Amino acid sequence: MMVPDANTLNVSRETFERLKIFADLVHKWNPRINLVSKRSLEDLWTRHIIDSIQVFRNAPKGDLWVDLGSGGGFPGLICAILAAEEKPETQFICVESDQRKSAFLRSAARECGIACQVISERIEHLDPLDADILSARALTDLTGLLGFAERHLKIGGTALFPKGAAWKKELQDAAKQWNFSYDAVTSLTEPQAVLLKITGVTRV
């Protein structure tokens, strides 16, 4: 497994050390709770960490960042690690209904020395969170994600949703139920994938 350096990732040495601690924790916990697939674990930095960093790099400023279905911490905890130095004013909430994965997220945040609230609830049971920034990766299709955005994204806020090669079809399907504006940013790690930056979500 290739591990990049701080310069390659364009992060400080302190942030890079936190990312390495996090990567080690994923390797330690993964055999027990399957945070990522065994195959993608071998390419953890490119498939998951760098993929999450590009979400952070495309985010606007905001006081509250909510990551839905955080799972193994991608992108939520990775973004929180970068924000600790680069956007210290931003608060992070990770929502994860699986109690074991929530325990991992809390442990990882503590060991990486970052502030991140972990909520162990199903997303649909939560009161509106009023997020400035909303992210979710590999959670559900875009139609479902926009339903979460309508409830939890502040008016004027931005949703950041990484999507795979079928993203255009997901956009077409979502447009049948939702009005929204979007910008599709080509992924650095997968040429056919994009990061969707979405604003102005309302029902059709």
UniProtKB/Swiss-Prot annotation:
GO terms for cellular component: cytosol. It catalyses: guanosine(527) in 16S rRNA + S-adenosyl-L-methionine = N(7)-methylguanosine(527) in 16S rRNA + S-adenosyl-L-homocysteine. Transmembrane segments: none annotated. It comes from the Bacteria. Pfam families: GidB. Its EC number is 2.1.1.170. GO terms for molecular function: rRNA (guanine-N7-)-methyltransferase activity. Coiled coil: none annotated. InterPro entries: rRNA_ssu_MeTfrase_G (IPR003682), SAM-dependent_MTases_sf (IPR029063). Its main location: cytoplasm. It is an enzyme of class 2 (transferase). S-adenosyl-L-methionine binds at G69, F74, I123, E124, R137. Keywords: Cytoplasm, Methyltransferase, rRNA processing, S-adenosyl-L-methionine, Transferase. It is found in: Cytoplasm. SUPFAM superfamilies: S-adenosyl-L-methionine-dependent methyltransferases. The keyword Nucleotidyltransferase does not apply. Specifically methylates the N7 position of guanine in position 527 of 16S rRNA. Belongs to the methyltransferase superfamily. RNA methyltransferase RsmG family. This is Ribosomal RNA small subunit methyltransferase G. It comes from Ruegeria pomeroyi (strain ATCC 700808 / DSM 15171 / DSS-3). The lineage of its organism: Bacteria, Pseudomonadati, Pseudomonadota, Alphaproteobacteria, Rhodobacterales.
